[in-house]
């Protein structure tokens, strides 16, 4: 059982409306996996270690505030943003270099670590690649004993630019994106435009017989398989994603990105054993004085979910409605051998949404009413956020409970149906 889908997108001026950067991602994971949305405030740390999903690494003196969408069983994140409006999403990729099953840093750990430690997209590239060099990547990426492993690619953006970072073990290449749009799927996509790279990347490829040392170096051509079903499936979605971005080129907005993430015909909104278990859209104005707005579903299938806004302000409390139960040291992920059981990780919103989704699937009048009210709520929040995106935030206290309040409005939609 391998994922065929996972897609991350970014659009920059002049492709977007209003001098904004629009970031979006679907997290496509096992259909029974719960994805939570959690917030961690900025924090100063004493010298010591931080425990990631499988290993401990050196902690830094200060970590930035982050909002994350993540599989509820692990430490890292599939996607998220930080207080400096850096956004990151990662994808599984496979290539000629074998993925390591030994426990190290997961790609999802690297997403969180970069968000906690980097205040620009380029610095996030440096954080990830430095950690790769020191600790490596590897370990089981699913909550069972299957031993499912992969390399990672990352799409990273901030207020000014975006970066694509693609890895194969400790080797990597990175491409800067300063205008237009870019997307990544479950395949390597960096070719000859390489703006940063591992110092041994080309030498290693030559030693492996993947490159002759003379022809023009294309990271994708050298490090990819020549042909696999996974790459072919991802290639179809990669091209479809580009087409959907091109269709709205010049006026890409948050609504555009939400529509793309909901597109089932292209395979971007995944269904089946692997499905879109969580979705994110961020709107980042280029002007420093304007806030970024980060929308998360915290529920499966964006087509029947509500994108809810989050804004970084002081004193944001824990996001209790989208946080899964904590099992501490008794969690089967922490015990060895790992994954001997699977606890119920459903958070309050997931439980209520699960009931509502079943009603929607029945295709009756009640389900149609729920869907309409969900869309109305989302539209209302998009319109409300437009004021902050254009005028800034005068009273930040109004936004402290923004995400949680919106979840409670979503609860009301489900309760009234």
From Swiss-Prot:
Organism domain of life: Eukaryota
GO MF assignments: cysteine-type exopeptidase activity; dipeptidase activity
Function: Plays a role in thermal nociception.
Family label: Belongs to the peptidase C69 family. Secernin subfamily.
GO biological process: proteolysis
Organism encoding this protein: Danio rerio
Keyword Transmembrane helix: no
Protein's name in the database: Secernin-3
Leader sequence segment: none
Sequence positions bearing Pyruvic acid (Cys): 6
Propeptide positions: 1-5
Residues recorded with modification Glyoxylic acid (Cys): 6
InterPro entries linked to this entry: Peptidase_C69
UniProt keyword list: Pyruvate
Active site location: 6
């Amino acid at each position: 059982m391998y994922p065929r889908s996972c897609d991350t997108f970014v659009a920059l001026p002049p492709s977007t409306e209003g001098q904004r950067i629009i970031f979006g991602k679907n997290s496509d994971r096992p259909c029974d996996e719960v994805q939570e949305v959690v917030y961690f405030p900025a924090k100063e740390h004493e010298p010591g270690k931080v425990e990631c999903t499988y290993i401990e690494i050196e902690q830094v003196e200060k970590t930035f505030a982050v909002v994350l969408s993540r599989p509820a069983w692990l430490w890292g994140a599939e996607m998220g943003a930080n207080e400096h409006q850096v956004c990151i999403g990662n994808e599984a990729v496979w290539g000629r270099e074998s993925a390591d099953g030994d426990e190290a840093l997961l790609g999802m750990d690297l997403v969180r670590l970069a968000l906690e430690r980097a205040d620009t997209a380029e610095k996030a590239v440096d954080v990830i690649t430095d950690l790769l060099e020191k600790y490596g990547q590897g370990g089981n990426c699913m909550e069972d004993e299957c031993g499912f492993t992969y390399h990672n690619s990352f799409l990273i953006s901030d207020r000014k630019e975006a970066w694509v970072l693609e890895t194969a073990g400790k080797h990597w290449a990175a491409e800067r994106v300063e205008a237009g749009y870019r997307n990544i799927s479950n395949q390597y996509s960096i070719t000859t435009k390489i703006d940063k790279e591992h110092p041994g990347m080309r030498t290693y490829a030559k030693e492996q017989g993947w490159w002759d040392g003379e022809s023009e170096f294309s990271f994708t051509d050298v490090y990819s398989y020549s042909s696999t079903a996974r790459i072919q499936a991802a290639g179809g979605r990669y091209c479809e994603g580009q087409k959907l971005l091109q269709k709205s080129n010049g006026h890409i907005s948050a609504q555009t990105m939400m529509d793309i993430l909901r597109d089932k015909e292209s395979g971007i909104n995944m269904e089946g054993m692997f499905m879109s278990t969580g979705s994110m859209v961020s709107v980042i104005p280029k002007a420093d004085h304007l806030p970024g707005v980060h929308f998360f579903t915290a529920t499966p299938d964006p087509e029947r979910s509500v994108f809810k806004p989050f804004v970084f302000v002081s004193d944001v409390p824990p996001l209790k409605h989208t946080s899964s139960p904590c099992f501490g040291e008794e969690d089967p992920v922490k015990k060895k051998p790992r994954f001997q059981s699977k606890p119920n990780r459903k958070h309050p919103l997931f439980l209520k949404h699960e009931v509502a989704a079943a009603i929607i699937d029945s295709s009756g009048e009640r389900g149609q009413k729920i869907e309409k009210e969900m869309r109305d709520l989302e539209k209302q929040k998009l319109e409300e956020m437009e004021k902050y995106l254009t005028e800034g935030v005068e009273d930040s206290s109004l936004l402290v409970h923004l995400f949680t309040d919106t979840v409670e409005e979503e609860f009301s939609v489900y309760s009234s149906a």
